[in-house]
């Protein structure tokens, strides 16, 4: 192989490595940018009569009374969803669900959190995932998720971003928080 061809190969190699590292760096820095609520507009606010609770899921059949009562509330998320919840036993356990006021359908995702005593700083920590701030004018839903670390010595905090489409929540991004 001639020296000129080798030089060209080396130049291409450095160019490729430099380009791929820039792409990698862009993905890493861009990955922590949270989605914005204004990028996920909701349909117009539903102002009609609440639908009858749809009993097409085990969740709806199990919590029929609580979910039916929730349909009388004003929507708080994505133009037509009401947020409701209930205690689920000991340790400050709490479940949250969203119900579509227009269709009466329950989103099948249950958000669940409970209190956990942290012996390191003698405080109660909420562990699990819960809805942080539903927005009536956006289909973007933000949740906080707290888990025990793999070594069990501290907690790991995340912010999860979901969008609702056709009565289904889809996780679109998870960002690990530094707490």
Give the ranges of each region predicted by the language model.
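Terminal domain-start segments
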Residues: 25-74
């Amino acid at each position: 192989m001639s020296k000129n061809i080798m030089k060209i190969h080396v130049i291409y190699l450095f160019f490729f490595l430099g380009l791929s590292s820039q792409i990698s760096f862009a993905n890493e820095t861009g990955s922590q940018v949270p989605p914005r609520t204004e990028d996920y507009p909701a349909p117009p606010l539903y102002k009609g009569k609440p639908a009858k609770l749809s009993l097409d899921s085990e969740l709806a059949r199990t919590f029929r009374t609580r979910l039916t009562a929730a349909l009388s509330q004003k929507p708080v998320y994505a133009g037509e969803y009401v947020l409701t919840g209930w205690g689920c036993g000991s340790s400050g356990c709490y479940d949250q669900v969203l119900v579509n006021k227009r269709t009466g359908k329950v989103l099948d995702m249950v958000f669940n959190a409970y209190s956990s005593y942290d012996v390191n700083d003698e405080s109660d920590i909420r562990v699990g995932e819960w809805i942080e701030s539903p927005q009536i004018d956006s289909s973007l839903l933000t949740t906080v998720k707290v888990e025990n670390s793999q070594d069990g010595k501290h907690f790991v905090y995340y912010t999860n971003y979901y969008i609702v489409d056709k009565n289904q929540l889809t996780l679109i991004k998870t960002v690990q928080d530094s707490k």
